[in-house]
Structures are given as C-alpha cells and as structure tokens.
Amino acid sequence: MNGSFFTMDDFDLDGKRIYLRIDINSPVNPETGEILDDSRFRAYSKTINELKSSKVVIVSHQSRPGKNDFTSLMGHARYMSNIIKKEIKFIDSLFSHDAINAISNMSAGDIIMLENSRFYSEETLNADFETIKNTHIVRRLSPLFDYYVIDAFPAIHRAQTTLIGFKGSGPNIAGRLMEREITMLDKFKFFRGSPKIAILAGSKIEDSIKVSRAFLKDNIVDYILTGGVVANAFLYAGGFNIGRKNMEFIIKNNDNYESLINSATQLLQTFRGRILMPDDFLLSPSGRHVTISESINDDEIIADIGFNTVDKYSKIISRASAIFMNGPMGIYEIPEYSIGTREIFNIVAETPALKIAGGGHTLNALNSMHLTKKLDYTSTGGGALINYLSGDSIPVIDALIENKRLFGGKYNGR
C-alpha cells in the first residue's frame, strides 16, 4: 500500500516548514502529570530526529474531555525533549497569534509543540471535509507549512481535523512510524506460508470478533487461538457453562453482549475447527484447576488457561509460519494466574515465525517478560490496529491516498 501515498523519501524536507501530527496520547498520572508509559514517545523519536534540519511543529492530543488525564501537552513537550536530547518549545495554544508568530519566526532545526488539539471543539466535529477545511484550525495553520507529515498511526481510524483537515493544503506525507506500521501489518496479512495463526485474548470481545471475522473470511489466518474473556465469550457461544461471575462480567462490560454472543456463535458454526478455545482453566479465588466439562462455582472467575490448553496451543504455535498476538491469556498481573500468558508468550517469542503483537496489555506483558525484542514488530495501535486488520475504511489513510492523487503531479519529489 505504501506506493499509494507520499512518504518522507519523496521530498527534500531540509529547511522546510513541517506540520508533524503524531499521537503521544499516553497513560498519565492525573495528580502529578507523570508520563506512565513512554513507548509512543520513543516510537516517534525516529521521525523527529530525521527532521532535525527542518522547522518542525508537533501537533498531538492527550485523552478526551471529561477524562481525568485530559491534560496540557506541556509535560509531553518536556518529556520528548529529554528523549531526543533537544529543546522543544511549548506553545500553550493551537492557532493563537502567539502560536502563529512563533511558527513564522522559526529557524531550521527548531521544534515547537502546540497545545492538546482536543482542547478545541473543532478537532472532533465529526463533520464532512468541506466543514473541516473551513475550521479555524485549518484556515489559520495551513498557510504556515510547506509539508504535512501525518504520523499518528494510533489515531488513523478517526476523521479528526488535525489528522485529515490539511489534505487539500499541500503534500500530506506518511511519517516513519505510519510507514513502518502499515508495512509490517501488510506483511502479516499477505504473508505466504502456513499455518498462520492469530492469538486473540484479553477482554475486548467486540474487537476480537471483528478481527476474527475478517481473518477467517479472507483466509488471512488458518487458526485463531482464544484466551481470557474473549475465550469465555466463544465458550458460552459454543454452549459451555462458564459460570455466573464470568457471564456477569461479559454483560456488565458489553452493552451489546447478546449481539456479540450471536456473532461468536455464527463464527463457530461457519468456521468449524478454526477457532480454538481452552480445554481447562485456573479459577480464582479458589485456585482450582478444572476442565471444560467440570462445573464452575458461582463465586469463581476464570483467571488463566490451564496446562492442557497451554500444551494444545503450544503445538500449533510451534508449527506456525506467522503469528499475530493481541491480549493476555488471563489475569497476568497476579503471579499465580500469569502462567498461561507467560508460557504462551515465551513459546511465541522462541518460534522462527513472523511475529507481530499489538494492544496495551499485550505490550505491557511482553515488556515485563523482557520479550519485546524477540518479536518482529509491536504495534502502537489499539483501535486503529483492529480497524486496519479488519479491512475497514480508514479515514487518515484514505486522506493520504487522496492527497497523493491531488498533488502527485505537482511535486516531483527530490
């Protein structure tokens, strides 16, 4: 897909005025402002360092209105400065006179970070492009830049003003993170070799069902291995008794749980034998080990997959040619219920297959086990990752493609 849009290799960006849209939306301590996970900051250092001879203006967002971590980006600018070892000037507005004056007076090598784009209602209009391009954000900022580098992969599924609003203003260029994400995800989707597997676990049932449908319908994978709450939903859909507390958790956290269970049932019927579920579990708080044929008490929750399931999954993983992994097998944060996740993740890490992982809990677990570097790629995306792998229309990528059609004949690149 990379040839469909501009990349940073297509232009000489030295000395140019660059609008750089990234996504450093990160876990933040709402009381102290401390950045609790800097993985996205580090992921963007390559793009920023490559633009060291340009005049770079960084735009990003943090959380959303109403959340306790909906904060200014002042601390983010300071944190990024420490990572790239270069001063980033913070401007506490997005398009004020002060912001425009600061941008207009930049020298090559300067970096500015503007205020949280979601402080402005125009960012989340959910409107058509004609409306978006006439916002104050676009009208006031667009004349200030030569190029627009769009590198916010984790937000590609959102048609927000600072992401797609400049597609008619000049060349919109995929940044290095965007380019790498798409390259690696496409590599998995179109990888030749069998068997290909997806490990879908954790608690996000709707996302996993969505990906499962796309992966199986388009024969992107041969098998799906389930764990966590995702497995519980498929087990219930398959007619198994998962216990009262486990079903209550599904109902409480999914308003559309009936629709999700129906979808899971249809997938099991349509793709028989290709969605694999646990055969045994560890239960909390009792610590009991039970097989799927045994009863689960009303006060017990499924906290981990059991040893039989680990053995069954391991045999499939060891033969895989390519693996996509999203979600832990159980409550991995509690040591006694982390065994399934640890065993499966370690087996994945040691296989020679193409290995790609995504999702916040997955990456946290991999980091805690010091396994991240053993994988071929770990994605920064959450909802964006799911939407991309599911084959959905992606507003930001669509905008990049349309922009190249608009400006491809006007710019001959380097």
From Swiss-Prot:
Q: Which residues bind ATP?
A: 333, 359-362
The UniProt keyword set, sorted, is: ATP-binding, Cytoplasm, Glycolysis, Kinase, Nucleotide-binding, Transferase
Superkingdom of the source?
A: Archaea
Catalytic activity reads:
(2R)-3-phosphoglycerate + ATP = (2R)-3-phospho-glyceroyl phosphate + ADP
Q: Which Pfam families match?
A: PGK (PF00162)
Give me the residues that bind substrate, please: 23-25, 40, 61-64, 118, 158
Compartmental location: Cytoplasm
Q: Which GO terms describe its molecular function?
A: ADP binding; ATP binding; phosphoglycerate kinase activity
Look up keyword Secreted and say if it applies: no
Q: What class of enzyme is it?
A: transferase
The UniProt entry's GO biological process terms, in alphabetical order, are: gluconeogenesis; glycolytic process
Q: In which pathway does it act?
A: Carbohydrate degradation; glycolysis; pyruvate from D-glyceraldehyde 3-phosphate: step 2/5
InterPro entries for the chain: Phosphoglycerate_kinase (IPR001576), Phosphoglycerate_kinase_N (IPR015824), Phosphoglycerate_kinase_sf (IPR036043)
The EC number(s) attached to this protein equal: 2.7.2.3
Keyword check for Nucleotide-binding = yes
What GO cellular component term, any one, is given?
cytosol
The family line of this record is:
Belongs to the phosphoglycerate kinase family.
The annotated subunit structure for this chain is:
Monomer.
Please name the PANTHER family in this protein's record: PHOSPHOGLYCERATE KINASE (PTHR11406), PHOSPHOGLYCERATE KINASE 1, CHLOROPLASTIC-RELATED (PTHR11406:SF23)
What is the protein's name according to its record?
Phosphoglycerate kinase
Gene name tied to this protein: pgk
